Swiss-Prot record:
Taxonomic lineage: Eukaryota, Metazoa, Chordata, Craniata, Vertebrata
Positions of the Collagen-like domain: 40-81
Name of the featured protein: Hibernation-associated plasma protein HP-25
Region annotation Disordered: where it falls in the sequence: 29-96
SUPFAM superfamilies named in the record: TNF-like
Residues of the C1q domain: 85-215
Amino acid sequence: MPAQRGGALSMGAAGFWILVLSITSALADSNNQGNSEPCGPPGPPGPPGIPGFPGAPGALGPPGPPGVPGIPGPQGPPGDVEKCSSRPKSAFAVKLSERPPEPFQPIVFKEALYNQEGHFNMATGEFSCVLPGVYNFGFDIRLFQSSVKIRLMRDGIQVREKEAQANDSYKHAMGSVIMALGKGDKVWLESKLKGTESEKGITHIVFFGYLLYGK
């Protein structure tokens, strides 16, 4: 019996102290909650973490503005020098300082102002086409107390006609025409007045022609 009482007392004492500790802990928690203080300031940032993995490529953005011009590049080497072929030439200018000869025949001019290519025949008064192409032909007439009627002919066909008369004064008349010629075509001036109709006074006639461009 005494042994049983002792064991019962020991168990009762242990339960008593457990109860005391539980109450004490509960009271301490209650006091801590009632007397809590505000949190302190944030601490300094921690060190950076290690870089993460690269993300997926983003969508294509709009085009940007043009960039500034670049600096000029170095000067290139000189190009090759080639000899250009000379342009074909055909020209003449002739003059007559007297009354025209008999009508309806080529006027034979006495003075060659230019005939370097030799395409105008001074003996016959005719220009012979050597270089086919487009030509400009013209004549210039100066009169004093005289009259003329001149026509420009091509292979026997009249192309242009000019009439001028100066009684007691000087007069100036001129004419020109552009036409295409083939090789061998002939061009000349001829008078339509008889020599007796224009023998008095002074007459100067200049006849000229030149190639504009070849065919």
